[in-house]
Amino acid sequence: MTAPADESNAHETVPLQNGSDLKEKRNGSSPYHMLSTYLSFPTREQEQWWSQTGPVLGRMLEASGYALDQQFQYLTLHYNQIVPRLGPYPPNFRSNLTVSGLLIEFSINYQQKGTNHPTVRLGVEPTDSFSGTERDPLNKVPLRAALNQFERIGVKGFDSQLYTYFEPKHALTREEQLRVATEIPGGDKRSTQGALAFNLEDSGINMKGYTYPGIKAHLAHVEVRSMITEAIKDLKSQGKGDWVEAWAKTADYVTEINGWGFHNLWGWDYVDPSLSRFKFYTWQFDVPDMTKLGELFTLNNRATSPTHLEGLTYLHKLWDIIDLKGSGKRELPADASQPPENTNPMLLSYEIKSGNPLPYAKVYFPLQGFNDLACVEKIARFWEHLGWKGLAESYPATVQSFFPNHDLSKTSHLVYWLSFSYSEKQGVYSSVYYHANAEI
C-alpha cells in the first residue's frame, strides 16, 4: 500500500486560472461574448438557454486551461447541439438527471495522470415542447433524435450499437409508461428514460449514455440483476466483449447490500462495444463510517488489487475532509427528500471493462444543501493534500467566478457532488458537479 502523495511526489495538474484573471477576460472579449455578438436564435427560449448556461460553460473552459480555439469549438457545440435540445425556457419537464430537476449539469474532472488540464463535462437529458405531455409523457423521442444527429455529423469514434441494444431492454413501452404513475412509488416524479454525457477532451468529444432499468424491470416483473446479467451474457455470445466475471462480482455485492431498485442507473460509452465500459449505479442511505465505505469501495473484498488498496488510502483522507456527518442540516427545496442529520448518504457506481475481472468503484459525496463555500474550501483541502497547491489556492475564487451574481458564502445549491475513483492509469480521478443555471 502506498501512502498518500505529498508535494514532492504528487502529479501536479494544470492549475485553474484565478477569478480575477477570468473577470478581466469577461470584461474584454471572451469567446462567449464574441460568439454572442453574432449568433441568432430561432426561438426566444433557445436564446435564454444560451444566455443562462453559455457564460458558465465559457468560464469553466477558460478556467480549466482550454486553448482559445477549443473554447470556441465547445461553445459552438453547446450552441448548435445542446441548447436546441433543452426545450422550453423555463423548463416544464423535470429531469431525474440532476438534483434540481434541471435538464443539464456541468462538471469538471481532475486527475493525477494522463491529462494536461482539467476536463469540462456536460450531462444533458434532451427534451422538447412535447416532453411530459400525452404525446411523449416520459421524454423518449428527443434522445433518439439527438443521437441520430451526432451520428450524421460524424463524431470521431461514435458508435450507437449499445444504445440500440439497451434502449428496448430498459426504456418503457407506451403501455408501460401509462402504468408508471399507479404502479411505481413516486412514479409521477420518475420521468427520465435516458440521458447523455459529454467529456470535452483535447482530442474531441467522448460521449456516454445512461438508462434507468429499474422501472422497466419492475413493470415487466423481472429482477434488475437478471435483466442485466442476461444482457451481459448475450453480448459475450455475440463476440462484443466479456464483462461476465466483473459483473458477477458486482451483482453479488449489490445483492449483499440490497442495492437494487428504481434508482439504479446503467451507463456505457458510445464507442465500439468491445471498448466500452459499463457502469452500474446504486445508492446507500447511510454509510456510517470509513469501514463501511472501504467495504463499498472493495465490494467487501471482492476487488482488492494493489490499485484498489492504494485508492482506499486517498479515499480515507477525503472522507475525513468532507465529513458529511458533521456538516449539519441541508438547506434543500421544500419538495426535496431531506436526509436525516448525522447520516452519510452516498451514491456509488461500479465500472467494469471487457476482459478485466475486477470492478472499480466510484464514490459520490452529495454536497447539495450544504453551504457552497464550505464545500469548495473542503475540496480545496483535498487538492492540497494531493500536492495540487496552485489548484488548491485558486479554487475557491475560481468557483466563485463561475457564478458572479451569487455569493458562495450564502448559497447552498450550486455545488452538487464530488466524486472519487482511482486507477493505475489515471491515479486519483475526481469530479465536481455544478448547477448549470443558477437562476433556476
Regions from the PLM with identified roles:
Residues 64-68, 154, 159, 289, ...:
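Helix N-terminus capping/helix-initiation residues
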Residues 12-125:
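Long, solvent-exposed N-terminal ectodomains/accessory regions
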Residues 17, 46-48, 52, 70-73, ...:
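Residue-identity detector for glutamine
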Residues 142, 151-152, 220-440:
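Compact beta-rich and alpha/beta scaffold cores in large eukaryotic transport/transcription complexes
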Residues 85-278, 282-286:
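Fungal eukaryote-biased detector of long internal structured cores
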Residues 1-13:
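PEST-like, low-complexity acidic/proline-rich intrinsically disordered segments
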Residues 9, 18, 27, 80, ...:
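Detector for Asparagine
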Residues 58, 69, 158-161, 271, ...:
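Intrinsically disordered, low-complexity, compositionally biased regions/tails
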